[in-house]
């Protein structure tokens, strides 16, 4: 069995020109199109197909054949669009300095808009046909029955659609609906003046967001971290009334749209699209808030290990031990298939196809897009972009994106195009589970206690950041929106008081609280851009924790059944709403025990961390 002790190398790979990187570390986009000439032919053919929408307009009521023709045309255009878009987009991400390729990307975006305009008649015309008529057509024409879920969901979402005049008025409001976020973005980027602080080692640094995060994560001098925290939050404290006015605009906008569409709350309006009951979010918040002891245990352990008299939020990310070994990419390729053994041999085989099929662009090169992602090219296969640098973070990023890619691979193999895409509510479940499986694999094989501690801290920090912090944020959003729903004023003081109260409710006496923590809400971009979004990070984490337990604990027959249910989830794509998809996999997010699976997971990890730390002494 392969040992997981990493090769000890001197440094991460240096930045190389793309031409100097071996082909086996670069994706092969010829799987989509052989060259730009073939791409252009596909682009031109797609343009012609879009024009075919016009011949179908006004004919849907003529019978099931016409509706089926429209659905098939939409699928055909969608599949071709994926290929035309991703070939240009992935090529551009290899070197974003290439203006010629960027122009081609923009060409495709123009074609997107053209397709949207050409098909804008479809939904109103379809919804003019009574649902029982469409259901009868699906009985008469088996090929049309393929689209049952998609068609019936369109009708479901019409429950809160207004008449023509009402929809027109709401469409006019869209012109200013983004104003609070746009103003927030301008205030927080272009207009924000980043302060400078002098570190204990002598140099003066400007506190950009990246520099601020780096100090909190690497600087072992608590006074430096405290100074960075105070100076960074002072920027938001200075403008807190402006941030409050902007956030009030978000809250008022959300409540206006919810009332106009006759929802009982902003939460109900936000969840309606994915057919998520409000009880899911309410259960998530209530269960998490009453199960915070493992989080507090972790804080207290960190305080003791770091030797601090007082423990603050700015002490929460500094490593407990120093450990700087490197994890070469080719070594990790040997470990990944072993890590997914609990998912069965078929899954392992398909994962090797992803790893060794020229689907991954591994290393950074000049001009390459930063970060990492998995691109779902329907009709071809997923592609993965990495900027692998031999660090532990890069290892888990690879495992994370591999989870997404395997989800895409299985969904695309078993679903027609119309159901191949999956919602964010489900999307992060496989990626988070992939990380958890890889963590277990690494921990079982680690021989260095420092490595074990680093791995455990990585896992625990993931739960704190992706679960507890996101639930706190969701709790905050819910309470802030209820201010306007109840007709109460929204002031900076009230918003800060809600946030400060939640910090104390979740972290208890394990933290020493700084007054400037009160304004942390002001700097969270999701609050302004995508309200009621972050809870999904936490529900995905809870789902993966529940699945991890079922896949790795219990009898062989129980684990085999869990594997089958999990693979069915991946193969199901977007063929149903998220809740029933997860329920069929054995996860019911309306039940407290599902959320408590994360709590139990964290509790176990903290216990293992305590043991590993004691092993150093």
Give the location of each predicted region.
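Flexible, glycine/threonine-enriched loop-and-boundary segments that flank and lead into catalytic domains
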Residues: 356-373, 378-384, 504, 508-529
């Amino acid at each position: 069995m392969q040992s997981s002790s990493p090769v000890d190398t001197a440094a991460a790979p240096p930045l190389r020109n793309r031409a100097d990187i071996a082909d086996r570390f670069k994706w092969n986009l010829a799987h989509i199109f052989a060259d730009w000439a073939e791409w252009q032919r596909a682009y031109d053919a797609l343009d012609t197909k879009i024009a075919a929408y016009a011949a179908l307009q006004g004919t849907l009521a003529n019978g099931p054949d016409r509706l089926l023709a429209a659905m098939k045309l939409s699928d055909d255009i969608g599949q071709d669009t994926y290929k035309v878009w991703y070939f240009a987009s992935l090529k551009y991400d290899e070197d974003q300095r290439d203006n010629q390729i960027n122009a081609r990307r923009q060409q495709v975006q123009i074609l997107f808009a053209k397709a949207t305009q050409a098909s804008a008649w479809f939904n109103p015309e379809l919804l003019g046909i009574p649902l029982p008529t469409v259901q009868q057509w699906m009985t008469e024409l088996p090929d049309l029955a393929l689209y049952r879920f998609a068609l019936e969901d369109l009708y479901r979402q019409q429950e809160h659609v207004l008449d023509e005049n009402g929809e027109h008025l709401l469409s006019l409001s869209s012109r200013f609906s983004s104003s609070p976020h746009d103003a927030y973005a301008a205030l927080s980027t272009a207009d924000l003046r980043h302060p400078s602080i002098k570190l204990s080692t002598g140099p003066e640094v400007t506190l950009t967001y990246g520099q601020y995060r780096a100090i909190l994560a690497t600087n072992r001098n608590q006074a430096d971290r405290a100074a960075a925290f105070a100076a960074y939050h002072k920027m938001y404290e200075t403008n807190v009334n402006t941030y409050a006015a902007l956030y009030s605009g978000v809250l008022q906008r959300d409540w206006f749209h919810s009332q106009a569409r006759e929802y009982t709350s902003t939460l109900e309006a936000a969840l309606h699209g994915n057919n998520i009951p409000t009880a899911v979010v309410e259960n998530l918040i209530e269960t998490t808030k009453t199960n915070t002891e493992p989080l507090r245990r972790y804080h207290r352990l960190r305080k003791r290990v770091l030797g601090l008299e007082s423990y603050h939020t700015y002490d929460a990310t500094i490593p407990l031990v120093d450990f700087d070994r490197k994890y070469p990419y080719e070594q990790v390729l040997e470990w990944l298939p072993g890590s997914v053994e609990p998912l069965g041999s078929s899954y392992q085989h398909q994962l090797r196809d992803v790893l060794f099929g020229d689907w991954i662009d591994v290393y950074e090169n000049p001009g390459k897009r930063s970060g990492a992602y998995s691109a779902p090219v329907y009709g071809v296969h997923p592609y993965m972009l990495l900027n692998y640098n031999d660090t532990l973070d890069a290892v888990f990023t690879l495992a994370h994106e591999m989870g997404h890619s395997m989800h895409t691979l299985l969904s695309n193999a078993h679903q027609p195009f119309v159901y191949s895409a999956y919602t964010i509510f489900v999307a992060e479940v496989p990626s988070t589970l992939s990380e958890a499986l890889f963590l277990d694999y690494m921990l079982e094989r680690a021989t260095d206690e420092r490595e074990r501690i680093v791995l455990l801290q990585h896992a625990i920090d993931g739960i704190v950041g992706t679960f507890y912090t996101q639930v706190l944020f969701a709790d905050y959003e819910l309470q802030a929106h209820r201010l306007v729903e109840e007709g109460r004023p929204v002031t900076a003081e009230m918003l800060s008081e809600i946030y400060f109260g939640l910090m104390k409710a979740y972290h208890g006496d394990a933290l020493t609280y700084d007054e400037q923590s009160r304004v942390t809400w002001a700097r969270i971009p999701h609050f302004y851009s995508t309200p009621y979004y972050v809870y999904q990070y936490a529900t995905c984490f809870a789902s993966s924790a529940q699945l991890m337990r079922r896949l790795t604990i219990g009898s062989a027959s129980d684990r085999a059944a869990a594997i089958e249910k999990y693979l069915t989830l991946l193969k199901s794509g977007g063929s149903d709403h998220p809740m029933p998809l997860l329920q069929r996999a054995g996860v019911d997010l309306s039940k407290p025990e599902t959320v408590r699976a994360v709590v139990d997971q964290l509790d176990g990890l903290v216990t293992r961390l305590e043991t590993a730390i004691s092993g150093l002494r």
